[in-house]
UniProtKB/Swiss-Prot annotation:
Pathway: Amino-acid biosynthesis; L-tryptophan biosynthesis; L-tryptophan from chorismate: step 4/5. The gene is trpC. Disulfide bonds: none annotated. It comes from Rippkaea orientalis (strain PCC 8801 / RF-1). This is Indole-3-glycerol phosphate synthase. SUPFAM superfamilies: Ribulose-phoshate binding barrel. InterPro entries: Aldolase_TIM, Indole-3-glycerol_P_synth, Indole-3-glycerol_P_synth_dom, Indole-3-GlycerolPSynthase_CS, RibuloseP-bd_barrel.
Amino acid sequence: MQIRRRSPNPPVEVDTLRYQVKVPDGEPRHILEEIVWHKEKEVDRLRESLPLLELRKQVQHLPPPQDFLGAITQGKTQPALIAEVKKASPSKGVIREDFDPVAIAQAYVKGGASCLSVLTDAKFFQGSFENLALVRQSVDLPLLCKEFILYPYQIYLARTKGADAVLLIAAILSDRDLSYFLKIIQTLGMTALIEVHSLTELDRVLAIEGVSLIGINNRNLETFEVDLKTTSQLLAARRDKIQALGIKIISESGLHTPDDLQFVQQAGSDGVLIGESLVKQPDPTQAIANLFG
């Protein structure tokens, strides 16, 4: 998947790296490219109101992050559950009208989730970094910031809002960015969940030093179609290398039934990331019990 980047702004310098993105012509070709183009402008606006230097100062005064990877390894369920606090998505629209991020997060904790994921994208998922901060204040589990990370700025912002881990999507990042962002995340004591959807993306990520956690997204982010066999096919193709490197695997998207969980666990997944099928239920705690029964 080749994502064109769009940014009308001048170069941005972070430490010794200089970021400048060519502006493509035309309209976005699919929803993922539309999200990326919008995110570039969104981050520019955030930088104007809260500079990166200020974020980095704030991070220095925070307590150490929790061990997200360790929580997966010692999962309270099998496979370990990353339960997602999610109001909406481009494919489903609003999933839960009476959305209360704190109440949902607390229900997940009660249900036995090992970690939580909080959507922070506003335009396409109706999330926010404020939701991440609210959840951080209300629960003790490790938190993943589920965001379309394009710049180091977003990593520091996620940390200031209480994230212990951040999502990096291979489809929207170059190899250089993946490697550099991973180093920033590790320097901050956080965990990177690096998401792939294809064998090409998986091979790119496996070639990067220091990767410990990979998410296999069963959803094609160009079409938003879901196929659970994505997890089994990628793991079957690279199982030996993944095991040799000691990398943990999370299966993401399209998980709705106990049979789905059994399928991806037998394929080799150490954990699952589930949002929609839990959020839409009146009682998310009971929904977890029904899935993991």
